A protein has these predicted regions:
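Predominantly a Rossmann-like dinucleotide-binding segment in NAD(P)-dependent oxidoreductases
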Residues: 1-53, 107, 187
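Conserved loop-to-helix N-cap of the C-terminal "lid" that shapes the substrate pocket in Rossmann-like
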Residues: 11-15, 164-170
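Solvent-exposed beta-strand sheet faces enriched in polar/charged residues
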Residues: 33-35, 74, 193
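C-terminal glycine/acidic-rich active-site capping loop/insertion
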Residues: 41-67, 88-89, 94-168, 190-195
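Short arginine-rich
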Residues: 176-186
Length: 195
């Protein structure tokens, strides 16, 4: 991709997933301030011709959630040495938790009073994970997640229920993306509801 009308850059492509995950874990985002950067000035277009790139390669922003939590976000296409670094780290007054999709079967947990993080390997004792992994050490992969997502969608349709994420969630994620883009242009905090 080289232009916004082709779908956008790193923020839309990668950032949308971590925004949705953050909203799921921490709640609605109130306001953002951010920057978008274009580090690669030209790319091959779909016809293999070099074309000026108008999209972001890297987007960094700070978000304030409605519950008072502050989060730092980054989406980048050109982080070399990392294949799938979609993840989060949440720290609080009594500990912290880390997740990275490259190691999607593990969580790292830090509890106050202990030195360092402990690794928790998901297994049969962690519901509903055990439905897919009958014994410790048998892990889910990315393609397994896609099968689970399709199953959730079909179950929701069969039971006349809404599954998550839905179109309303996608719209709310897009509002955050639009606010980051506006903040990058105007160089100031943007409230999500002001769009």
């Amino acid at each position: 991709r080289t232009s916004l009308d082709e779908g956008g850059g790193a923020l839309m492509d990668l950032g949308s997933h971590i925004i949705s995950l953050a909203r799921f874990l921490l709640g609605p985002i109130k306001e953002v301030v951010g920057i978008e950067e274009n580090n690669i000035s030209a790319r091959l277009d779909k016809n293999k011709k070099l074309k000026k790139s108008e999209i972001d390669d890297r987007s960094i922003f700070i978000a304030r959630f409605e519950n008072g939590i502050t989060g730092n976000f980054e989406a980048c296409w050109n982080y070399y040495g990392s294949n799938m670094n979609l993840g989060f780290e949440i720290t609080g007054s009594k500990g912290a938790i880390k997740f990275n999709q490259q190691r999607m079967n593990e969580l790292e947990l830090y509890k106050d009073g202990f030195k360092g993080f402990s690794r928790i390997e998901a297994g049969p004792e962690h519901k509903p994970y055990g439905n897919f992994c009958p014994a410790p050490g048998h892990h889910l992969g990315f393609n397994d997640l896609k099968v689970i997502e399709v199953a959730e969608l079909l179950l929701a349709q069969a039971n006349n229920k809404t599954c998550f994420p839905d179109f309303e969630e996608a719209y709310k994620v897009q509002l955050v993306i639009d606010a980051v883009k506006k903040s990058s242009k105007e160089k100031k905090w943007i409230k999500i509801h002001s769009l």
